[in-house]
Design a protein with these regions (language model features):
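Extracytosolic ligand-binding ectodomains
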Residues: 2-4, 15-19, 31-428
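Twin-arginine (Tat) signal peptide motif
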Residues: 8, 12-14
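N-terminal signal peptide c-region/cleavage motif recognized by signal peptidases
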Residues: 25-28
Length: 428
C-alpha cells in the first residue's frame, strides 16, 4: 500500500533520497569509460602546454690566465709602492668588458689568476698547468727571462701568450717567438716617443744619467738609438753613484755632491735612466742650471696615466676606480688591453679557438679600440702592438706620440720602435 509522501516514515524517505542521489552520480559503465578515454587523450597535451620552454644555448666559456709575481710590500711608507692588485684589477675589468659584449655573441669569459710566490711553482710550471686545464690564453706580467721561458715551454701547444710587462727590445728582436704577442711597448718605442717630443721642442742636447741596474743600461742604450734616429745629441753622460736618494727618509750630505754632479754641462734636458725608481725623482729641481728632466721619471712616455681623459679615457678611468678603488696604472691598462684583444678578436671571428685567433691577430683586418684615438694593431714582423704613447708629467698630459709631422709609408705608429727594415726578429 502506497502512503502519501507526507505520511511516509522518515527512514524510508531517507533511503529513497540516498538511492536517487546515488543513481544520478554514477553513470553507466560504458558512459564512464567514454568519459575517461578523452581525459586520458587530453592529458599529454595538457602536460606539453605546461612544460617549460627549451633552455637557451649555454655560452661557451673561454678562460684567460694571468701569471704575475707577487711583489713584497715595502717595510715602511712608500707613496709610490705598487698596489697588491696591480695588473690583476686590469684583467678583471677586461673580463667584465668581454662578458658585456659576449652576451650578444653567446661567448663567456673567466679569469684564472695565478700569482707566483716565493717557494711556489715557477712561471713555466704554472703556465703548463693552466693550459692543461683548458686555459688557452695566457697574459704574463713577468720579467723578460720568464716570459721567454713560458713562450718556449708552450711552443708545441695552441696557447697564445701576451707580454704585458717586459719592455725588453730583445723579445721583439733576436728572442722573438711566434706565440708571443707584446702589448707593453718596447723600450725603443718609449724612447722614440720621448725623442719625437724633444725634436718638436728643439731640445736637442741631452745629459744622460744612467743608474746601476741592467734595466737602466738597456734604457740608456735605447735612448742613444732614439737620439741617433731623430738627430739629437748626447752632450754628456754620467753614471749615478749616490744611491737611492729618491727613497731616502731625509736629506743627507750626498745632496751637495749631487748638485755638483750637474755643474759645468751644456744641455737642454737631463734624461734619467732609473727603471726601479730609486733615484730618478731626486734629480728634478736639484740641477745646478734650471733644466727639465725626463726619461724614466719627470717627463715620461707611457701607455696610461690618470691624467688621460680624452678619447673616452675618462669613462675607463671612472669604471676602473669603481672596480678597484684606486687609480689605473700602466700595467693595469696593458693587462686590460691584452684581455680585450682576445674578446675583440673572438667577436669578429665568432670563435674563441686560439688556432683560429692567433693568425687573425696579425691580419691587416684586426684592430682593437683602446682609448687612444686610433685603433691598435700588431706588427706582423715582431708581434709588437702598435699604439700611441702619451708623454706626461705627474699632473698633466703634455703630448701624444707619434707627433705630427713624423710620417711613415704604412702608419705613423710605425715611427715608434723597431721598423721592418731594422728588425732582427726571425720568428721561431
Amino acid at each position: 500500500m502506497l502512503l502519501p509522501a507526507g505520511r511516509m516514515p522518515a527512514p524510508a524517505r531517507s533511503f529513497i533520497l540516498a538511492l536517487a542521489l546515488t543513481g544520478a552520480a554514477a553513470p553507466p559503465a560504458g558512459a564512464q569509460a567514454a568519459q575517461q578515454a578523452p581525459a586520458a587523450q587530453q592529458a599529454p597535451a595538457a602536460q606539453q602546454d605546461s612544460a617549460a620552454p627549451p633552455a637557451a644555448p649555454t655560452p661557451s666559456e673561454t678562460r684567460i690566465g694571468l701569471i704575475y709575481r707577487v711583489q713584497p710590500q715595502p717595510s715602511s711608507y712608500d707613496a709610490e709602492a705598487a698596489p697588491e692588485d696591480e695588473g690583476v684589477a686590469g684583467a678583471r675589468m677586461g673580463i667584465a668588458d668581454n662578458n658585456t659584449t659576449g652576451r650578444f655573441t653567446k661567448q663567456s669569459y673567466a679569469l684564472d689568476e695565478a700569482p707566483l710566490t716565493e717557494g711556489g711553482p715557477g712561471a713555466v710550471e704554472t703556465a703548463r698547468a693552466l693550459v692543461a686545464k683548458g686555459t688557452p690564453y695566457i697574459v704574463l706580467a713577468l720579467p723578460a727571462d720568464e716570459v721567454l721561458a713560458v713562450a718556449d715551454a708552450l711552443k708545441d701547444t695552441d696557447a697564445v701568450i701576451f707580454n704585458a710587462a717586459a719592455p725588453d727590445d730583445r723579445l721583439r728582436g733576436a728572442d722573438c717567438r711566434k706565440n708571443l704577442f707584446h702589448v707593453v711597448p718596447s723600450r725603443a718605442m718609449q724612447t722614440d716617443a720621448l725623442a719625437q717630443y724633444l725634436t718638436l721642442m728643439r731640445w736637442r742636447k741631452l745629459f744622460l744619467i744612467v743608474g746601476p741596474n741592467e734595466a737602466d743600461r738597456l734604457y740608456a742604450e735605447a735612448l742613444k738609438n732614439s737620439a741617433r734616429k731623430f738627430g739629437l745629441k748626447i752632450s754628456a753622460e754620467k753614471p749615478w753613484t749616490f744611491g737611492p736618494l729618491a727613497k731616502a727618509r731625509g736629506d743627507t750630505p750626498t745632496r751637495a755632491e749631487a748638485m755638483v754632479f750637474t755643474r759645468g754641462l751644456d744641455y737642454d734636458m737631463a734624461i734619467v735612466a732609473d727603471e726601479a725608481g730609486d733615484w730618478g725623482d731626486y734629480v728634478p729641481y736639484r740641477t745646478v742650471d734650471p733644466r727639465p728632466v725626463g726619461g724614466t721619471q719627470g717627463l715620461v712616455a707611457t701607455t696610461w696615466s690618470p691624467v688621460l681623459e680624452t678619447w673616452g679615457a675618462a669613462q675607463a678611468q671612472n669604471r676602473f676606480r669603481r672596480l678597484a678603488g684606486r687609480l689605473m696604472r700602466p700595467l693595469d691598462y696593458q693587462v686590460w688591453t691584452s684581455v680585450r684583444i682576445v674578446g675583440n678578436a673572438a667577436t669578429v671571428r665568432k670563435t674563441t679557438d686560439p688556432a683560429a685567433l692567433a693568425p687573425f691577430l696579425i691580419d691587416p683586418d684586426f684592430n682593437v679600440p683602446a682609448y687612444k684615438g686610433v685603433s691598435l694593431s700588431f706588427r706582423p714582423w715582431d708581434r709588437q702592438l702598435r699604439q700611441p704613447l702619451i708623454v706626461v708629467q705627474p699632473k698633466m698630459l703634455v703630448s701624444v706620440a707619434p707627433e705630427q709631422g713624423f710620417l711613415h709609408q704604412r702608419t705613423p705608429l710605425d715611427t715608434l720602435g723597431i721598423d721592418l727594415p731594422e728588425t732582427a726578429c726571425k720568428l721561431k
